[in-house]
């Protein structure tokens, strides 16, 4: 028994060493390109790793010699599945406590919207919130300042997200009533970085519960129809 335990420990150490060696090669290759990785994980493809960076998701061979940028799709089922964004959903849900939520009384769907208070179509979407909610669509907001993290929009949205009543502060900003300065430990950069990783490049960007991203504004009825159809397709019904 003792010998078997020692052998298991030895094998674990060997495989751990191999994993760290692979990661080291990957980090070295990324460093040459000026890319900083936040996390390296296993990928669905043998011989490759998934690398999370602040500028998106990469797939890198274990030896660090080849890099693929962009989403990976699983086409083994009836419909393609974006496995890259599906992976990122755990990070999105980790920000749930920071989201500004408009919950539908009879919830049928939940969407997460990356928004910017300076975006015209974001205003249009928010003006129709009662219609989305009436159709059973719960809307959760994360901030995505299009002009960057040092912009006035970023500062204003941080104040909104730090307000005692975030929903009222957001409603007021969208109604043109201005933003009252406030501070807290909410980091808008986390919202922004996740948006970039999900492939968001403009607002509003609507993320479904499985990581599928719908770029741009969708009216309440159009959104409901799309969500119903998407749910049917992905559930196989």
From Swiss-Prot:
Signal peptide positions (record): 1-21
One Pfam family named in its UniProt record: DsbC_N
Disulfide bonding pattern of the chain: 119-122
CDD domains noted in UniProt: DsbA_DsbC_DsbG
Cell compartment(s), UniProt: Periplasm
Keyword tags: Disulfide bond, Periplasm, Redox-active center, Signal
InterPro entries listed in its UniProt record: DiS-bond_Isoase_DsbC/G, DiS-bond_isomerase_DsbC/G_N, DiS-bond_isomerase_DsbC/G_N_sf, Thiol:disulfide_interchange, Thioredoxin-like_fold, Thioredoxin-like_sf, Thioredoxin_CS
Domain of life: Bacteria
Keyword NAD listed: no
Main location: periplasm
UniProt key word Methyltransferase: no
GO CC annotation terms, alphabetical: periplasmic space
Recorded family membership: Belongs to the thioredoxin family. DsbC subfamily.
Biological function: Required for disulfide bond formation in some periplasmic proteins. Acts by transferring its disulfide bond to other proteins and is reduced in the process. DsbC is reoxidized by a yet uncharacterized protein. Also acts as a disulfide isomerase.
Description of how the protein assembles with itself and partners: Homodimer.
Protein name: Thiol:disulfide interchange protein DsbC
Organism field: Salmonella typhimurium (strain LT2 / SGSC1412 / ATCC 700720)
Gene: dsbC
